[in-house]
Amino acid sequence: MKAFMGDDFLLNSKTAVKLYREYAENMPIIDYHCHLSPKEIYENKTFATITEAWLYGDHYKWRIMRANGIEERCITGNASDEEKFFAWAKTVPMAIGNPLYSWTHLELQRWFGIYDVLNEKTAAAIWKKTNELLQGDGFGARDLILKSNVKVICTTDDPADALTYHELLKESDFPVQVLPGFRPDKGLDISSPGFADWVRSLESASGMAVSSYQSYLDALESRVRFFHNAGGRVSDHALDQMVYAETTEEEAARIFAAGLSGEHVSFEDEKKFKTRTLQYLCGLYAELDWAMQFHINALRNTNTNKFSSLGPDTGYDSINDERIAKPLARLLDSAEKKRQLPKTILYSLNPNDNYIIASMINSFQDGKTPGKIQFGTAWWFNDTKDGMLQQMRALSNMGLFSRFIGMLTDSRSFLSYPRHEYFRRLVCTLIGGWAEQGEAPYDMELLGKIVEGICYRNAEEYFRF
């Protein structure tokens, strides 16, 4: 029997252990998609308690606390930080089998040197020790990033953002690149009641009057170039439902005018507007050699009462099951026909889409850029041992796992970087297993190079930050 969360955690063969120790463990990190705050990084934010560092904003934890019967007061409510931590400690033993159980203990080990199991009996001692350490040196946001050997962070930013803290970080002595990620979801959601207000913010940020669809595209382009000048090389689109509908420039202009004036926009018109605007952005991203990310098939804010009382991103989302194959293929093809398909990373929240994406990406590789179209790492509800291995196996079966750009945190927490370790251990177990079973040669130079590529070097070459 293996020790709980011991040195060989998730490593199920001698080859896996060797690959991890010699090739994966000490590789740097490129976190090319996350939700960390550039302001908090710049200010080297510190944390008053482990609750603030661990539970504030973490809807992954909130979901299973509710499932464990914890009242909302101890999750997002006005309970003290100590009460909230003890509520989490009560939940953790019930979470065996959930990745949060592993991540919780991995983070306790790596950040705080705590190897005890977190439960109601150990909660008081762990509360005391973690808080003492957090008050000392070396636990600010920048410190945690540096300790994790992170080289690049890409945040998630609205096109109207001034990127003030990205610029301040660039001018500082902080050695990690903190770069903006262009997330124009509000600019594509033309049926939203807030669309017109967002266009006004785009006007203000760009310094351009927006009164027509063409002037809207011009303002978007100005913000893309602003992000580019600030070091941005990635965009991100939350496409909860993948859509595609051809339209003319004239019809897109009509739809834009309706949305800007607050008129009702039908779903069919929304599809046309999104398609036309995405096609335009594809060309712009391709020109600037950006990587475009699509996060597909999330079903958001499913609980109306909770959305009304707590708002979005509070743990009431789930997996969608919309069909993606035809609209996704048509959108990629429409860009490719114009030679305007940028580097693209595709993620779906629905694991039933794994083989759809894994097979589709190789229909659009260009024979020049290795892995130009990527099947993105297991995302959100799939960010588990099984989910990661399923994604990696689908990619291996359909394409080149060796060209995979690997892991990202997609996190709001500065303590989440051990998730890269979790991922890397699974990569080594998968590849090591192939060698152990005679499916790959026992060539450590070859296998080690593949491991290093997936952990770091492929992303370094792909993004060229």
Curated annotation (Swiss-Prot):
Organism the protein comes from: Bacillus velezensis (strain DSM 23117 / BGSC 10A6 / LMG 26770 / FZB42) (Bacillus amyloliquefaciens subsp. plantarum)
PANTHER family, sorted: URONATE ISOMERASE
GO biological process annotation, one example: D-galacturonate catabolic process
Catalyzed reactions per annotation: D-glucuronate = D-fructuronate; aldehydo-D-galacturonate = keto-D-tagaturonate
Highest rank taxon of the organism: Bacteria
Keyword Transmembrane: no
Family: Belongs to the metallo-dependent hydrolases superfamily. Uronate isomerase family.
NCBIfam families in alphabetical order: PRK02925.1
Protein name, as recorded: Uronate isomerase
Molecular-function annotations in GO: glucuronate isomerase activity
Gene3D superfamilies: Metal-dependent hydrolases, uronate isomerase, domain 2, chain A
Alphabetized InterPro entries for the sequence: Metal_Hydrolase, Uronate_isomerase
Pathway assigned in UniProt: Carbohydrate metabolism; pentose and glucuronate interconversion
Keywords: Isomerase
